[in-house]
């Protein structure tokens, strides 16, 4: 589960393995090993993934199945924009 979540979040963010490796200050082969499930990232890196991708560490670890957006790092304007987008998509989904 962890390996799939790391790969999925990286791909959804449009990052290559090399880009993620640079952001985490690790090698690309480390990222590749994590995504293949050959090795497991330390707790420190799980927390860094959560912060980088704005999700909970529980989601990354597979404890939660729903991806929840951590909005604590967004400012009020960004939160309002996210709220407006959710309302828009919810309204249009009903049609």
PLM segments and residue spans:
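Helix-turn-helix-like N-terminal two-helix hairpins of bacterial/phage DNA-binding regulators
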Residues: 1-63
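Interfacial/linker helices and their anchor residues that mediate assembly or domain coupling
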Residues: 64-95
